[in-house]
Amino acid sequence: QWSGRATLKNYFSVGIWSNYRPMGINDFFEPRVDGRVFKQDASYHAMTWMSTDYRKTLAFDLKGSYGRGNGQRYSYELGPRVRVNHKAVFRYKFKFDLDANEKGYVTDYHPQEDSIIFGNRNKETYTNTVGGSYVFDNKTWITLNVRHYWSKVDYDQFYNLKENGRLEQHENYSGNEDFNFNVFNVDLMYSWNFAPGSFLNVVWKNSIYESQTIENNTFNNFFENFQDTMNSNAVENSFSIKVSYYLDYKYLFKNSG
């Protein structure tokens, strides 16, 4: 594994990262059964990114990556940000991930026979995030993030996971495992730095979930999918207050002595 980054005189930053696993990996999580393993072959992953000058009113982040091992993985991100003034910043980020011909767990077909079904799948994931922050003063600020996560998975072949961790084609399994999954999140947080190293955070979170099995490979388009998500009854809300207080033991011991 290696990485590098550089920042130019105009505050334009670039970076690169790469990872290579020549021996492959033993994945003990993907089978979902204690004592079983899924052996994956050698893999590599490379990523590059760039960022323009954040001091300017308009700035951009761009990232792209490619990986090969358990299938092929393509990913890219685009994130413009607008700095209104020294108090307010707004951000948008779009991320797309494609896992092509990835092998992964599907179900325990015959759990009494320790038969574990894997599938060959294409998984597309779209994430849109809009956020912003506003600083009231040097001790208090508020942040808001709104995110829509959409993942759709299409299976075209099924396998049996053998005891040696390898896959063999399964001729009899014919279940429909194609699915569509969405999450819509709203996160609002107020922060107060009431003492050095000490914070009060008040957080409200709202989440909407939508999941469905897809028949005959008939996935909805983005707008139909988003509308189904907003009409879902699977809604969660949470409210939390967290206080973190920094204690300087040297200061306490000094005063007590």
What is each PLM-predicted segment?
Residues 1-257:
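Exposed, low-structure sequence patches enriched in small/polar residues
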